[in-house]
C-alpha cells in the first residue's frame, strides 16, 4: 500500500478496508510482510496465518540455509570475526556469534549484514516467484529485519507484531535465558517497535492473550481473502 495506514487491527473497521482496497487489488498475487522485534511474538502470528492456509517464507530459516548454500559467508565470518565462531564441522556457533554480533558497533555489524543480506534477499525473491508460478494468490514473508533492510518496498502491505518494551524483555528472558544486557543489545540493534508502528500498514497488538491476537489475525485474514 502506498499510504501507510499504521492502525491497530483491533481498531480497524473491516468493511471500510474492503471497500477501500479490495477492488484495487482484485486478483493480484499478494506479497505481505510480517515483522516485529525480539520477543514480540511474531512467530506466533506467523503460525496462525500458516494454519489458516497462507504460505509463509521464513527469513530466519533462509538466513540459516544461506550459510550452507553460500560458503563465502562463513569464510567472511572466520576471517573477520575469528575462527572461534566456526565449530569443528565447519558450522557457525550461532549463540556465541549472535552474542558477539549484537555487542559490537552498528558499523561493524553492518559490514556482516552487507555480506549476508543480499543472499537472503535473493532466496526470498526466488521463493516469491515460485509461489506465484505455481498459482498461489498470497504469500507472507516473516522477517524480523523487514524494515531495517528495506524489504518492505517490494511488498503489497506490511504487518507489525507489537508489544511494549517491558514485555519484550520479559518474554526473551524466559525464552532464551539471556542476561538483561544481552537482551537490550538485541533490542537496540533493531528499529524500535514504536518507530516501526509508523512504517507499516497494520499493527497487531500482541501484548495480551492468544485469543485477542487471534481475533486480529482473523480480521486481517478476512481482508486478505477479499483481495
Curated annotation (Swiss-Prot):
Task: Output the Gene Ontology cellular-component terms.
Answer: cytoplasm
Which BP terms does GO give this entry? coenzyme A biosynthetic process
Location in the cell reads: Cytoplasm
Plastid as a keyword of this entry, yes or no, is no
Which EC class is this protein assigned?
Answer: transferase
Q: Which GO terms describe its molecular function?
A: ATP binding; dephospho-CoA kinase activity
Chief localization: cytoplasm
Under Enzyme Commission nomenclature, its number is 2.7.1.24
Catalysed transformations (reactions): 3'-dephospho-CoA + ATP = ADP + CoA + H(+)
**PROSITE patterns attached here?**
DPCK
Q: Which UniProt keywords apply?
A: ATP-binding, Coenzyme A biosynthesis, Cytoplasm, Kinase, Nucleotide-binding, Transferase
Q: Which Pfam families match?
A: CoaE
Q: Where is the DPCK domain?
A: 31-227
Q: Which residues are listed for ATP binding in this entry?
A: 39-44
The protein's annotated pathway: Cofactor biosynthesis; coenzyme A biosynthesis; CoA from (R)-pantothenate: step 5/5
Q: Which HAMAP family match?
A: Dephospho_CoA_kinase (MF_00376)
Would you identify the family this protein belongs to, as annotated?
Answer: Belongs to the CoaE family.
- Spell out the NCBIfam families in the cross-references: dephospho-CoA kinase (TIGR00152)
- Function per UniProt: Catalyzes the phosphorylation of the 3'-hydroxyl group of dephosphocoenzyme A to form coenzyme A.
What's the protein called, per UniProt? Answer: Dephospho-CoA kinase
Species of origin reads: Clostridium tetani (strain Massachusetts / E88)
Amino acid at each position: 500500500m502506498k499510504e501507510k495506514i499504521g492502525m491497530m487491527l483491533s481498531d480497524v473497521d473491516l468493511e471500510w478496508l474492503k471497500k477501500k482496497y479490495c477492488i484495487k487489488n482484485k486478483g493480484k498475487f499478494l506479497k505481505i510482510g510480517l515483522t516485529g522485534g525480539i520477543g514480540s511474538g511474531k512467530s506466533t502470528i506467523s503460525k496462525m496465518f500458516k494454519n489458516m492456509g497462507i504460505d509463509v517464507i521464513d527469513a530466519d530459516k533462509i538466513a540459516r540455509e544461506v550459510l550452507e548454500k553460500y560458503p563465502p559467508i562463513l569464510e567472511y565470518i572466520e576471517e573477520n570475526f575469528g575462527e572461534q565462531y566456526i565449530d569443528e564441522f565447519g558450522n557457525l556457533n550461532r549463540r556465541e556469534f549472535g552474542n558477539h554480533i549484537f555487542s559490537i558497533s552498528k558499523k561493524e555489524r553492518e559490514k556482516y549484514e552487507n555480506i549476508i543480506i543480499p543472499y537472503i534477499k535473493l532466496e526470498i525473491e526466488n521463493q516469491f516467484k515460485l509461489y506465484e508460478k505455481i498459482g498461489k494468490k498470497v504469500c507472507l514473508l516473516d522477517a524480523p529485519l523487514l524494515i531495517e533492510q528495506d524489504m518492505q518496498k517490494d511488498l503489497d502491505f506490511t504487518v507489525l507484531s507489537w508489544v511494549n518494551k517491558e514485555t519484550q524483555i520479559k518474554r526473551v528472558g524466559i525464552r532464551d535465558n539471556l542476561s538483561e544486557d544481552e537482551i537490550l543489545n538485541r533490542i537496540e540493534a533493531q528499529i524500535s517497535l514504536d518507530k516501526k508502528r509508523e512504517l507499516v500498514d497494520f499493527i497487531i497488538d500482541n501484548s495480551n492473550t492468544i485469543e485477542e491476537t487471534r481475533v486480529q489475525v482473523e480480521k486481517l485474514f478476512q481482508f486478505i481473502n477479499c483481495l
